[in-house]
Amino acid sequence: SYPVGKIGLNQEMSPLIFSLIRILMMVIFLFPFLRFSSIKKANFKFVLVYGFLMGLGLYPLMYLSLAQTTSTSSMILVMQFSIPFGVIAGSIYLGENVSQKRWLLISLVLFGLAIICFDPIVLQSPYSLILGCLAAISYGLASMISRKLADFNALEVNGWMAITTLPIMTILAFLFQNQEFKIILPHSL
């Protein structure tokens, strides 16, 4: 999705509007898969947390990062921080057992990613690097939370994510991308 996102952002579309369109399409396509009885399940709160981390954390931050960077491939690498971060967060918050071998491998991954991120082309866009790291943290936390979602299928989780974040994303896009929002709105009616 990174190259497609970069192409979309290069076509004069703002990151928040791009995120809003992505979430809106998810609502349209995934609505038929929602089971409203799921709201009563004890773990539904984790669906909401997952949704906010993905819909309001990962997507907008990732697209803001892509809009600021000169190197899409470097942002793809930065997003790989999400994997070790998810394992670390799972160890801390969920009490998951992580072997010494896995800690060693996580350290090597973090060290390798840190070396790659000091490539001069990455450092040309420090704001993009920060946004990419925040997106990776959000994605890592969402990955950790997803372990609590065994009672739900993936289509349903993503559908709830889209429905719960659509109103907030719409407000954010309207507040921060007001001009573009006003241009798009009449064309969609």
Annotated model-derived regions:
Residues 29-38, 82-104, 120, 176:
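C-terminal transmembrane-helix exit sites in multi-pass transporters
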Residues 3-12, 66-68, 115-127, 175-189:
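Membrane-interface helix termini and inter-helical loops of multi-pass transporters
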Residues 1-2, 31-73, 78-79, 115:
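Specific transmembrane alpha-helical segments of multi-pass solute transporters/efflux pumps
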Residues 17-28, 54, 63-97, 135:
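Specific alpha-helical transmembrane segments that line the substrate/conduction pathway
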Residues 16-32, 49, 105-108, 127-131, ...:
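Hydrophobic alpha-helical transmembrane segments of multi-pass integral membrane proteins
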Residues 30, 50, 89, 101-118, ...:
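Hydrophobic transmembrane alpha-helices of multi-pass small-molecule transport proteins
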Residues 41-42, 46, 73-79, 95-115, ...:
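Loop-to-transmembrane alpha-helix entry segments
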Residues 1-17, 121-148, 167-171:
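Glycine-/small-residue-enriched transmembrane alpha-helix faces in small-molecule transporters
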